Amino acid sequence: MSYLGVGVSPGNVPVYHGTNLKVMERRMRVVELVLRFVICGLGLVAAILVGTDTQIKEIFSIQKKAKFTNMKALVFLVIANGIAAGYSLLQGLRCVVSMVRGNELFSKPLAWLIFSGDQVMAYVTVAALAAAAQSSVFAKFGQPELQWMKTCNMYEKFCNQAGEGIASTLFVCLSTVLVSCISAFNLFRLYGDNKGKSSARW
């Protein structure tokens, strides 16, 4: 293996590892950009679906209105999706500017900041999804032992729309986890580069 980043195959054909690395980095940047805008779009969709979810039901001549604020888990879900959408929009714009200028990340402080932000978003969205999913199970099936009735039997439209919002949040969660993995790679790659440069000096 040459120190110039050029390897020689068994057939004596030069292989440019540096070029392959740049291609991989470019693809990862495109994937990161797509994922961030997916989070932004689906997070906004989930927040709107749940935030506008209402249904009025008349029970014994008394009108009762179901809305997302009646369940704290759904309030958390709306807030988490809104924050994730806004954060991902800002990070997506940063990715676009970086790709247009052709420059890469990075200083280590900025890499740490992005990594930390992505980790927080992943944990927050996963927690919101878990809380909303548990509440939806109680609403759908009830809890006979605690005498909790099945509310979805009365508010079917409300539950269906909330379910659509939770489904969108599932894709948001998966995307935030993937983005956090990419940002972790981008961060620790900087330390790997420095280690390689130090070894080259010796």
Cite the ranges covered by each PLM segment:
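A surface-exposed beta-alpha-beta supersecondary segment
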Residues: 2-9, 16, 58-72, 76, ...
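Plant-biased recognition of short, low-complexity, intrinsically disordered N-terminal tails
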Residues: 1-29, 192-202
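Helix-boundary and loop/linker segments of multi-pass membrane transporters
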Residues: 21-23, 66-70, 104, 154, ...
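A hydrophobic membrane-anchoring alpha-helix module
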Residues: 160-202
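Signature of small four-pass
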Residues: 29-46, 50-53, 71-136, 176-186
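Cytosol/matrix-facing amphipathic helices and coiled-coil assembly/linker segments
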Residues: 20, 44, 54-62
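Juxtamembrane loop segments immediately following a transmembrane helix
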Residues: 60-64, 131-165, 197-202
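Cytosolic juxtamembrane regulatory segments of membrane proteins
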Residues: 65-70, 109-112, 191-202
